[in-house]
Each structure stands twice: as C-alpha cells, then as structure tokens.
Regions:
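N-terminal secretory signal peptides that target proteins for export/translocation
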Residues: 1-7
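Short, low-complexity N-terminal intrinsically disordered segments enriched in polar/charged residues
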Residues: 28-61, 65
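A solvent-exposed, acidic/Ser-Thr-rich amphipathic alpha-helical stretch
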Residues: 60-127
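Short beta-strand edge/turn micro-motifs at domain boundaries
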Residues: 122-124, 144-174
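Beta-strand elements of well-folded, non-transmembrane domains
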Residues: 129-133, 151
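Bacterial N-terminal signal peptides
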Residues: 12-23
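Short, surface-exposed coil-to-beta transition loops
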Residues: 107-109, 142-147
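Transmembrane beta-barrel outer-membrane domains
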Residues: 43, 102-105, 140-142
Length: 177
C-alpha cells in the first residue's frame, strides 16, 4: 500500500466508524419506537401546531377547535379549563396589546420535539413572536418563550389536552424527563 492509499483507507474507516456511532446513538426523546403510524401521527401533530400558530395571523379557525373539550391552557399563573374558556382567554386580549394593534403578527414555532405514545403525545417548542407595527416597518421581536403540550387523539383527530406557555428558559414541573 502506498502512503496515500493508507491515508484514504484510514479516512474511510474513520468515516464509517463515525457513521455507525451516530446511527447507533439514541436521542433520549427518540427512545419510543418510530412506527409508520407514529410518523403519520407526528406529521398530523406538527400540522395541528402549524395551523394553530397560523391562526394568529388571521387564519380564521376558532382557537377552541384545536383543544379537547376538557382541555386546559396554562398561561403563567392563569389556568383556563375547557375549550370555551380557552377561546375566551384569546378574545379577552386588549385591543391596544401590541399583538392586536400591529399591522401584522407572526409567531414562529421552532425546535419542535414531538413524541407519540399511541393515542397520546407530547410536544415542546420554542415560540418567537414578531410584529410589524405599520406597513413597511421592519419586523421586531416582541417576545419568546417555550410551550409544552400534551395531546390526545379523539375520534381520529389530534387535539391539545393541556398547553403550558412559559418563559424562555422554563420547564413545567410535571413535564416528562
């Protein structure tokens, strides 16, 4: 073997070993077996969350329609139980709040982690709210936080059963480790 071919062989061996190591490594949240059904459920949940956040920009659906009938939304120290109470919480946001009086509001969900457990699931994400105050203005950051959701599949449809909205560096005490 030449010096160059030994180097190439070592490089390929290292790449294969690294690839195998990465393939065999297990992320903590990915420990649940990923079946075809779980992948479809995960896609449905991701779509539910995307539609939920799209709704803030005038998507039209009632916020309560994303929740199970007996759902709970925890926002800071306030808790709203039932789809009607959750809908009411959104309607109660004052007209002079930046989210309401701005030209546009966009909420960007990122770092979405969804784990499906049959007919239940959990989802956690980071949300970033941006507003454009007047047409032509640059967007500005309004707030950022974390969301932790418990979901349930009812009559073939994924719905939020509990939604906890927290600050940018918080985690609920009852959240799975």
């Amino acid at each position: 073997m030449t010096k160059g071919s030994v180097g190439k062989t070592l490089a390929w061996s290292g790449a294969v070993a690294l690839s195998l190591g990465l393939a065999m490594a297990q992320a903590p949240a990915a420990s649940a077996q990923m079946t075809a059904q779980a992948m479809m459920d995960r896609a449905e949940i991701e779509d539910l969350l995307a539609r939920y956040y799209w709704n803030f920009g005038g998507g039209g659906a009632a916020f309560g329609s994303f929740y199970a009938p007996d759902a709970e939304m925890v926002l800071g120290k306030n808790s709203y139980k039932g789809a009607a109470a959750i809908e009411g919480a959104y309607k109660a946001v004052p007209a002079d709040a930046p989210q309401r009086k701005s030209f546009s509001l966009n909420i960007l969900p990122t770092n979405i982690l969804i784990v499906v457990h049959g007919a239940t699931a959990t989802a956690q994400l980071v949300f970033t709210e941006t507003v454009v105050d007047k047409q032509g203005d640059p967007p500005r950051l309004l707030t950022q936080g974390r969301e932790f959701d418990h979901l349930v599949k009812l009559k073939g449809r994924w719905l939020i059963s509990k939604r906890q909205i927290l600050g940018p560096n918080a985690k609920p005490d009852d959240w799975p480790k």
